[in-house]
A protein has these predicted regions:
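Acidic, metal-coordinating catalytic segment for phosphate/diphosphate chemistry
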Residues: 18, 373-505
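Gly/Gly-Pro- and Ser/Thr-rich, intrinsically disordered tail segments characteristic of DNA damage-repair
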Residues: 1-292, 447-505
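DNA-contacting surface of Y-family translesion DNA polymerases
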Residues: 8, 229, 237-415
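Composition- and surface-driven signal marking solvent-exposed, interaction-prone regions
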Residues: 80, 343, 360-363, 433-437, ...
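Short, well-ordered secondary-structure micro-motifs
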Residues: 191-192, 357-360, 430-433
Length: 505
């Protein structure tokens, strides 16, 4: 088997860099954070510029954490300043370093998701000048994997120089710089980029390129901590590993070699993580068998569409019911646009922390409690599903979901998150071609709920009306035609129709 060479490229603080470029500012020296401050200071920042991160700010903080970190940093600067006094402030790191009497200031840029998508398309077009689409996997809006194997010999170039060529061309055309990782498999390329490159000193353009193979990975990173720095190891995985005395990738690799009679062996890992232990063990050794062609040929066994939103404030039960109704309407629209049907819809309701901090609500709740990622106690989410007829009109879906909502929701609690998903997707053409199989044991059949001719005509009329609505929205935008309920206080559809990924377009 031919040895492969993969390159992973991550655009540096992408959203923040784009906002700096659009303002004519240097992305590497400007203090800027991308956040919608209209959502209060609790809103999550989508990006923080590299210069602002230097003051102890993480990549995805909440806005109040940025405010606090800058305030603390300015207090230290004031203490060290001449006469313990700051005479002004600046948003530029270079000027700040040369002027001890200045304080730290920063720009707050509201998200512009459509602009970021446009920049991402421009970057991808640069890659396509050098690489075939079959050799590129778009991992996210700002990150790609490239199988560079066949290009290196043809161009008589090293992987490092090829990565630099791509990054510098992107920089020249868009102003956005990047970090790259090179590896003998996809996992090592990702780890080289995420861990090794980001610890390197950047060049004058902010570019970092790191390279790993299986042996150098074991030498450099078997003792690395924390485990959460590694791809696919989240807080839950790391906590479970550390609770069992496994703190590093080297620990996991050694554990996988243990004898059956020893406490630490691969059986321990399989008991902890099930079949996922196989991937964890491979990654501990720097092994990844998935190749680019495997990604391109992958087809999921079951397809689904998910809609989710975090409400800007805690909602009472009645108010959140309207949002569930709207989200189901939006889901029906997506199914129609994509010519799909489903036979099952799932609903998950996440509750707000105030449900447990307000005594008048807490006294009414006696259910399970979980701890969120910030260490706060939150009521256990409610979850349920309902079956629906394939091709059912929007009103049928909306009635089914609101009934499900009324069934599973705790009416005493405040709601913060809502997620719905359409399961078992199938193309309309496939559904229409399949004969409907009668089920003697179906509740609907037994209850005699087969539609009458008049009901069927009404349903077909509603479907035709919905098709017209879909056509109008596709031509003139999702807010071109709305339901009256979308204007009720607490409704979110009008606002969300102007968003991409839950943020301002």
């Amino acid at each position: 088997m031919t040895n492969r060479t993969y390159i992973a490229i991550d655009l540096k603080s992408f959203y923040a860099s784009v906002e700096c470029i659009e303002r004519g500012l240097n992305p590497l020296t400007t203090h800027l954070v991308v956040a919608d401050e209209s959502r209060t200071t609790k809103t999550i920042c989508l990006a923080v510029s590299p210069a602002l991160k230097m003051h102890g700010i993480g990549g995805r903080p909440r806005l109040f954490e940025v405010v606090r970190a800058v305030r603390d940093a300015n207090a230290k600067r004031k203490y060290r300043a001449p006469q313990h006094r700051l005479t002004g402030e600046t948003t530029d790191a270079t000027e700040l370093a040369a002027s001890p009497h200045l304080g730290i200031a920063y720009h707050i840029a509201p998200p512009r998701m459509a602009l970021y998508v446009a920049y991402s398309v421009r970057v991808y077009e640069v890659y396509l000048r050098h690489i075939a689409p079959a050799d590129i996997h778009i991992y996210s809006i700002d990150e790609v994997f490239i199988d560079a194997t066949s290009y290196l010999d043809t161009l008589h170039i090293s992987a490092h120089d090829f990565a630099l060529r791509l990054i510098r061309e992107v920089l020249q055309e868009t102003g956005v710089t990047a970090t790259a990782g090179i590896g003998t498999n996809l996992y090592l390329a990702k780890i080289a980029m995420d861990i090794v490159a980001k610890r390197m000193k950047p060049d004058a353009d902010g570019v970092r390129v790191a390279q790993l193979d299986e042996l150098s990975y074991r030498h450099a990173l078997w003792a690395h901590r924390p485990l959460t720095d590694f791809w696919r190891i989240g807080r839950g995985y790391a906590a479970k590993l550390e609770a069992n005395g496994l703190y590093t990738m080297g620990d996991i690799a050694r554990c996988s070699l243990g004898k059956a009679s020893e406490h630490y062996n691969e059986d321990l890992l399989y008991r902890l993580f099930g079949v996922q232990a196989e991937l964890l063990i491979d990654h501990a050794w720097g092994i990844e068998t998935t190749r680019m062609e495997d990604i391109k040929h992958y087809r999921p066994k079951s397809r689904s569409i998910h809609h989710g939103q975090v409400l800007q404030m805690p909602y009472a039960t009645d108010k959140a019911r309207l949002v569930v109704w709207e989200m189901t309407d939006a889901l029906a629209h997506d199914l129609a646009v994509k010519h799909l049907t489903c036979d099952r819809i799932e609903l998950t309701i996440g509750y707000d922390v105030e449900s447990l901090t307000r005594p008048e609500i807490r006294s009414l709740y006696h259910g399970r409690i979980r701890t969120d990622r910030y260490g706060r106690s939150v009521p256990w989410p409610s979850h349920g599903h309902c079956t629906v007829e394939r091709g059912a009109p929007p009103r049928t879906l909306m009635n089914a979901l609101t009934h499900l909502y009324d069934t599973i929701v705790n009416p005493h609690l405040l709601i913060r998150r809502i997620t719905i998903s359409a399961q078992h997707l199938r193309a309309i053409e496939q559904h229409s071609a399949d004969a409907k199989q009668l089920d003697l044991f179906s509740a609907d059949e037994a209850a005699g709920t087969v539609l009458t001719e008049e009901e069927r005509r009404a349903q077909e009329k509603e479907k035709a009306l919905h098709a017209a609505v879909v056509a109008i929205k596709q031509a003139y935008g999702k807010n071109a035609i709305l339901r009256g309920a979308n204007f009720i206080d607490g409704a979110t559809m009008r606002q969300r129709n102007g968003q991409i990924g839950g943020h301002k377009a």
